[in-house]
Amino acid sequence: MGWTMRLVTAALLLGLMMVVTGDEDENSPCAHEALLDEDTLFCQGLEVFYPELGNIGCKVVPDCNNYRQKITSWMEPIVKFPGAVDGATYILVMVDPDAPSRAEPRQRFWRHWLVTDIKGADLKKGKIQGQELSAYQAPSPPAHSGFHRYQFFVYLQEGKVISLLPKENKTRGSWKMDRFLNRFHLGEPEASTQFMTQNYQDSPTLQAPRERASEPKHKNQAEIAAC
């Protein structure tokens, strides 16, 4: 291989590494901003990967490279739970607790994705293969509704047959997630995480919420999700 070809190959590999790793200077407008305060308590053991962004868990989708628009059309992310047990089966839930807005969440929870019967060995590798009760719906926060949290939960299924009620299948909004969990005695999640984004047409100068002093304290993950 000639030196010219080697230089071209090296340049291509370097560019690929930069895209895959998503490394950005902390002062760059495209740097991933981490969630703060109580929102970080939600991030426990789960990893969520989108194209170009990498692991977006516990971060804000940056307002650069049209990421906030791209994420509305990307297919489902890769979800990994490194702590999954090979012989177990799991349930994956993705919801938006801030529908139509975090200030007035009248349609909490909006169900974006629900998959059951996921093998632990697959979940550990990021392969979400199972019974899809609600097909993946990409984050699409309404204009002027502020930042939305997109939350992912993994529950241990323990051989239970999981299903949605007919009325739950009619709409994704105003889903009574707590009733669903109680109906199947699912208990606390094995892992969880979340990220934030807002409508891509909204002002990029708006900051993701950092303080929630007016919101009540909660005792468990399911209650934290509802705040």
Swiss-Prot record:
It is found in: Secreted. Residues 1-22 form the signal peptide. Pfam families: PBP (PF01161). SUPFAM superfamilies: PEBP-like. It comes from the Eukaryota. InterPro entries: PEBP, PEBP-like_sf, PEBP_euk, Phosphatidylethanolamine-bd_CS. Keywords: Glycoprotein, Secreted, Signal. Residues 209-221 have a biased composition (Basic and acidic residues). Gene3D superfamilies: PEBP-like. Residues 188-227 are annotated as: Important for secretion. GO terms for cellular component: extracellular exosome. Glycans are attached at residue 169. Residues 202-227 are annotated as: Disordered. Promotes AKT phosphorylation, suggesting a possible role in the PI3K-AKT signaling pathway. Belongs to the phosphatidylethanolamine-binding protein family. This is Phosphatidylethanolamine-binding protein 4. It comes from Homo sapiens (Human). The gene is PEBP4.
